[in-house]
Each structure stands twice: as C-alpha cells, then as structure tokens.
Amino acid sequence: MLAVLGFATLGSFMLLVMRKYLSAFTAIMLTPIAAAVIAGKGAKLGDMIMNGLDTVAPTAALLLFAVLYFGLMMECKLFEPIVQVIVRASKGDPVRIVVGTAVLSLLVALDGDGTTSYMIVCSAFLPIYRRLGINPLVLATLAAMALGTISGTTPWGGAATRGISVLHLSATEYFVHMIGPMALTSLAIIAVAYWLGLRERSKIDAEKLAAYKLEIASGEAFEPVKADWRMWFNAALTLLLMVLLIAEVADLLVLFMVAFVIALLVNIRAIGDQQDLIKRQAANAVPVMILVLAAGVFTGIMTDSGMIEAMADAALSIVPEGWGNVIPLFTAILALPLGFFMSNDGYWFGVVPVLAESAAHYGIPANEIARAGAIGQILHMMGPTSAPLWVLLGLVKAELGDFQKHALRWGVLVSFAYVAFALLTGAISIT
C-alpha cells in the first residue's frame, strides 16, 4: 500500500509540475501531505515536516549567503574578464560557446559544491547566451549533468561521501575504479553539448550572428573593465574561498558568511549602500530558500511515513532469486529514479545499505554498490530534492517543469551511458 502510494505521489508531483497545474512550491508540499493523510498518518504530519525542515535548514542558510556572495561578485564584475576571454576564444560561434559551457561546468564541479559551480558557470556564460539568444535551458542542462557526474562521483563531493561513510569503505578503493567511467561520461556530456550547440546555431538568425562576430572582432562587444585593487582582492578572496571549501577547513555556511562580510566591507563602504545590496540580492535568494524548505517538507514526509522504504523494498523484490549477480547493475539502474526523487541522505543512508546487505549474500563487495549508487547523481541534480537546482533555475529564470522537459531526456541518456561505461571498465560487474 505504502509503495503504491509513494509511486503515485511522485507521479502526481511530476504531472502537476510539468503540466503547470501547480507551481513547484505548492506541488512539492501538497502532494506528500495529501499522501500522508490518505495513508492515515495525518496526526504525525507536524513531526514529519519538522524532521524534514531540520535536514534542509542549514542548506537553506548556506544558499542564502552563497547567493549574496556571488551576487556581490557579479555586481563588482569579477567574472567579466573571464566572459571576455571565453567570447574571444569562441569567436561568437554558438557551438564553441555551448561546448565551452560543458567544459567549464565539468571543471568547476570538481570543487564539490553545486551552488558555487552553478553561479560561476552562469556568471561566465549567461550574458553570452542572452546576447546571442541561445536557450538558457541548454546551459542549465549541461551544468546539472556535469555536477552530477563530477561532484556526484568524487569522494569529496558529498553524495559519494555518504556512501563511503555508511558502508565503511576506503575512499581510494571506491574512487580509483570510477575515474575511467567518470571521464568517459564527461566526454559524453561534451558530445551532447556539441549536438545542442549545432541545434542552437541553426535557430539563430545568420545576420545577427554575423553582426555579433564583427562586434567581437572589433572589440565593440566588450565593456571596459577596470582592474583596480578591489578586483584583485575579490579574485584572491574567491580563490581562497574555493581552496578552503575543497579542504573542508570549516562548514560551507561559515565560509560563505565570513567571505560575504569581508567582501561587503571592502567593496561597499556606506552602510546605506550595503543595505541596498543585501535587499537586491535577497530578492534572488529568498525564493530559493522557500523552495529548499518546501523540498524539506517533501523529504520529511516521504521518508518518515515509510513510503521511501516501501518503494525501495518493492523495487528490490523485482530481482528474481538466483539473480544476485546482477544486483550492482540493478542498483545502478534503480539509482536513476530513486536518485531523482529522494534526498541524498534518504537514499544513501536508507536504501544503499539495504542493497549492500543483499549484495553481500552473493559475495559482491560493497564498493560496487557505492559506485553503482553514485551513477544516479546526474538525475538527482535534476530532481526536486536537489537544493542547488533551485539556485540554477533562479539564475536562468526557468520553471522546474520547463527545465525537466528539456533536461531529462539528456540526463537519462547520459546516465545510461554512465552505467554502460561502468560495466565496460569493471567499476561494477554482473558476474
């Protein structure tokens, strides 16, 4: 009963959002609440919602200060020189621009933090996309796939870290076998970018494209950027922030809070101007925070009501007796839908240990289950429980339903390619 209700809840949510019957905010809250009432758990709704909010509150606060920090950096034109270098290198060719988006997305995803990655990529490329009329959903799709592939696979990215800790694995033993499939999947993303770039180039008016190329060649396309001491300070502060973030010197929230305060004092001295900056950037941050908190309601109800566990058990029951050798492959495929709908905590701490225990009965090492589980991160980055996704959607000014209509076909394709690469390289096995 709970499994059926859980799948029905997820299907209803997708239908309501993609058909635009409800906004993402209302759908992500109302569907699990209705399901909990139907399941007879209405009396426990308050506790389930609070448990869910407890898990996402730190993330919501982190996103607030990350948006404030990078919003300030954008107003200070920190990334403008990078944009100009990219534009000159691309020579105004949409194919090169879109492929460059994929390459930069893959590189910045190495820092492991989705919000940071999205804001850097959007800062560099979104002005170019808007100038040429390239669909910003192309940027969002590539950035999400890159983050899921790199940050979702690396031991320091957060998702795999959960699997390594809960299954008591060696990070080296887990990761060394994932480097090959991760690299091949990155190439697959670049191939998708090339195809999307060709498609976007065919949509752009030839005269408009030719005029833009002339502007680039003459230098008219660029605004002069004054590289004063504040520009160099901002660059050094941002670089230091990235280093401390990767080194895990302190919690991300603490790092962004301190960095924002320092940047605010250096770049804007007048108290009134500081307050105006916070008001402007808060307008971008607050909608993101609201959606993250709503996702916490979704996660709390789905997890504490037992629907997630029932769905996982139902999926496991599909594997016939004697087919234990295919559990790693089954885990990789199951990771795609579960990763899409579930929070990383719920998936890695709730589902993966059950799969690993089942695999152990057939002599399959837990490392393979962790690797298989990480493959679902590409679709996780496109799902409603991915907090950084709401930042990305805010930056490109897109609705969740529109994004998923565009992105899911490519996300599913690349995810299955990831499964195939993992099998070919021996990261997971079926023998």
Q: Where are the language model's segments positioned?
A:
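Structural signature of hydrophobic alpha-helical transmembrane segments
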Residues: 1-6, 57-65, 115-118, 180-183, ...
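Hydrophobic alpha-helical transmembrane segments
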Residues: 3-8, 26-29, 60, 95-102, ...
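Transmembrane alpha-helix interface/packing and boundary motifs in multi-pass membrane proteins
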Residues: 13-21, 70, 104-113, 144-151, ...
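Membrane-embedded alpha-helical segments and adjacent helix-loop junctions characteristic
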Residues: 42-130, 271-358
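Membrane-core helix-loop-helix motifs of multi-pass transport proteins
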Residues: 127-214, 221-225, 365-366, 375, ...
